[in-house]
């Protein structure tokens, strides 16, 4: 049953049919989950450690606008054509072999980000529960994320429905606890506690931290129903993610006088820190692995002439 096979493989090499498209909210929650990640906390803390709050706000604003332009343009292409980023590259000037090269680059890059996020998870869990080595936590986290990614868009959507609100509530409580006792005026007007970052460096840091996610937007928006959905979810997801998470982390960097926001949250939160790390890794790392698999499928199809399953 070709149609069933394509659906179970999340239409890795073909257009997503209209009946398989989703509501904008379903996709928007996952996009927000990508942006409001621990990675964003880390970027914000680095900005806060090296910039004043005002300069960090400007850097986040400029970087966010750049990301939103790229995200919307590629997202609209994804919803109109209904194919993944790597397949879209075939018809966007790269050609078949060029799209295979793009696919390989993306596959390795996202696999690397998967490893980085999993490493942060393993380190944090080891610090909180030292009875197991880091490699064991990395193996457990990787296996859990892989199981979610293998089952495709539907399971990943439900994962986002559960983990995004949980992450925001838990992280919000932890941040409020950490900032308690600090003067809001001092946090907003005080000098950076560490080596100064220039505005250009801060903007590059903001844009560079999520540019790969922005480039992979068609992998997600091919499930949207109309271009306006892409605009809505981008403005909601990227803007709220960058500002709400980024600026909060800037104040954390000022308050704790360190850029190690992972250490701040996990060491001060105990069990809550464990839950924060777990929800943080689940809601973004499944997409790292998912997009990496889509890119690998396209490269195998072009270079080997074999159509392999995304799973």
Model-derived regions, located:
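Transmembrane alpha-helical segments of multi-pass small-molecule transport proteins
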Residues: 100-107, 128-151, 165-173, 198-215, ...
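Select transmembrane alpha-helical segments in multipass membrane proteins
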Residues: 20-29, 66, 96-108, 193-203, ...
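Juxtamembrane transmembrane-helix boundary signature
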Residues: 61-94, 101-109
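Selective recognition of specific alpha-helical transmembrane segments in multi-pass small-molecule
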Residues: 37-40, 65-70, 106-115, 166-176, ...
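Hydrophobic, small-residue-rich membrane helices and short re-entrant helix-turn-helix hairpins
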Residues: 22-24, 151-161, 212-240, 256-259, ...
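Membrane-water interface regions at transmembrane-helix termini and the short interhelical loops
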Residues: 48-50, 75-77, 120-128, 142-163, ...
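Helix-loop-helix connectors at the membrane interface of multi-pass transporters/channels
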Residues: 87-91, 118-136, 288-311
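Membrane-interface "cap" regions at the ends of multi-pass membrane proteins
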Residues: 1-54, 198-203, 215, 222-232
């Amino acid at each position: 049953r070709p149609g069933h096979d394509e659906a179970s493989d999340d239409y890795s090499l073909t257009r997503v049919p209209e009946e398989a498209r989703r509501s904008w909210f379903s996709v928007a929650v996952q996009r927000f989950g990508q942006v409001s990640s621990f990675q964003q906390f880390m970027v914000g803390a680095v900005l806060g450690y090296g910039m004043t709050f005002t300069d960090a706000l400007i850097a986040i604003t400029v970087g966010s606008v750049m990301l939103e332009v790229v995200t919307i343009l590629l997202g609209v292409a994804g919803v109109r054509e209904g194919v993944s980023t790597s397949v879209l590259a075939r018809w966007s000037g790269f050609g078949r072999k060029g799209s295979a090269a793009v696919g390989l680059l993306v596959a390795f890059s996202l696999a690397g980000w998967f490893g980085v996020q999993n490493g942060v998870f393993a380190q944090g869990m080891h610090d909180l529960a030292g009875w197991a080595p880091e490699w064991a936590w990395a193996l457990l986290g990787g296996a859990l994320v892989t199981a979610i990614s293998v089952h495709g868009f539907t399971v990943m959507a439900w994962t986002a429905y559960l983990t995004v609100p949980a992450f925001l509530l838990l992280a919000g409580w932890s941040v409020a606890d950490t900032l308690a006792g600090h003067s809001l005026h001092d946090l907003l007007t005080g000098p950076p506690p560490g080596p100064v970052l220039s505005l250009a460096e801060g903007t590059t840091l903001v844009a560079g931290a999520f540019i790969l996610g922005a480039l992979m937007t068609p992998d997600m928006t091919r499930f949207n129903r109309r271009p306006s959905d892409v605009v809505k979810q981008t403005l909601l997801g990227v803007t709220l993610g960058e500002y709400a998470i980024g600026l909060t982390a800037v104040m954390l960097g000022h308050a704790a006088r360190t850029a190690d926001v992972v250490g701040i949250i996990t060491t001060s939160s105990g069990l809550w820190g464990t839950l924060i790390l777990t929800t943080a890794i689940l809601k973004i790392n499944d997409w790292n692995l998912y997009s990496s698999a889509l890119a690998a499928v396209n490269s195998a199809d072009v270079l080997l002439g074999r159509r392999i399953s995304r799973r």
